[in-house]
Swiss-Prot record:
Required for rescue of stalled ribosomes mediated by trans-translation. Binds to transfer-messenger RNA (tmRNA), required for stable association of tmRNA with ribosomes. tmRNA and SmpB together mimic tRNA shape, replacing the anticodon stem-loop with SmpB. tmRNA is encoded by the ssrA gene; the 2 termini fold to resemble tRNA(Ala) and it encodes a 'tag peptide', a short internal open reading frame. During trans-translation Ala-aminoacylated tmRNA acts like a tRNA, entering the A-site of stalled ribosomes, displacing the stalled mRNA. This is SsrA-binding protein. It holds the Pfam family SmpB. It is found in: Cytoplasm. NCBIfam families: PRK05422.1, smpB. It comes from Nitratidesulfovibrio vulgaris (strain ATCC 29579 / DSM 644 / CCUG 34227 / NCIMB 8303 / VKM B-1760 / Hildenborough).
Amino acid sequence: MSKKAPGANVIAQNKKARHIYELSDNHEAGISLTGSEVKSLRAGHVNFRDSYVDFRNGEAFLVGLHIAPYDNAGYAQHDPDRDRKLLLHAHEIENLARSVEQKGYTVVPTKLYFARGKVKVDIAVGRGKKLHDQREDLKRRAEDRDTQRELARF
């Protein structure tokens, strides 16, 4: 049997996060889910555009992650917008919480994927970009695309 392609197990990516924030310090975190939530994720019914990580009582929670109810779950439906606990080591939570205390910094999810049958979340520390920085980024990416097209032509 052949192995799956390396990027085939990605559930969703938060492309908007790269546009709004300057991202650094990536971490892989587990996430505490119910069975119907995992089945809904396998179907791709997730939206985490406005989600972020909140720190309470020495624990990390993913807030704003919307996982649509699973169609075949029956009467035991999950709350689609509940806060979900992230599974990180205590020292990782302390480091992330310390970085969020600085003004203008937040922790945002960048990717949701399956790794060895478990759902994982890629989170990163982000600092909000100003509007002119976002525009400069778009211009630079457009120029890079144009140069790649020119190079591909020859």
